[in-house]
Amino acid sequence: MIRSFLVIIVSAMAVAGCAGPIETRVQSHQLIPAVEQKGFAWSPIDPIANRDTALARDLVDKLLAQKGYQQAPDAAILVHVALADRPADIAIDAGDDKTVRPLVAAKEQKSFQSCKDREHRLTVSLFDQSRGQKLYSGSASEYHCNGTIAQSLPFLVDAALSGLDGETSDVPLSTVRTRQGLE
């Protein structure tokens, strides 16, 4: 009886590393007010080399439509989507030899975690071509051990575009959202 109870406890602890709260780290920045005509075109440099990138663009397209934006070939707004999937246990620095600064810190593995985390990151940028300025930039990222980037994308798109058409600001707004799901 006691042995069975211990097996149940150990099994529950092992599985606990797979499901639980997922933090979506969000950074959004409305640099200039949106244009009245909310037509947009896709950046010609966005690669559609795989189905995850194609899915990201499709989800961004749908959410922009819900926010009143319409795709048009001669639109003033240019939309760029960047998608990344990388090992989370490496840090990313930027700069030259004298001014190196950390962009992303390495993530430590949780106790009882049986696999290594990956970071799923989506960045969506809107440029006002008529004014020659960046209109909006939003990024969202999550750590996952077992979840796929395709499973993360609906949440990443919603988070990355959460500040679109908000108040303009000189500094980006950083927030963290928490949801339940497969880590």
Regions found by a protein language model. Give the residues of each.
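Second-shell loop/turn segments in exported
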Residues: 43-51, 68, 110-112, 140-147
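C-terminal/domain-edge helix-coil "capping" segments
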Residues: 19-31, 119-121, 128-137, 141-183
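Acidic helix-start/capping segments at beta-turn-to-alpha-helix junctions
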Residues: 72-90, 176-181
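Short, intrinsically disordered, charge-biased short linear motifs at domain edges
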Residues: 2-5, 132
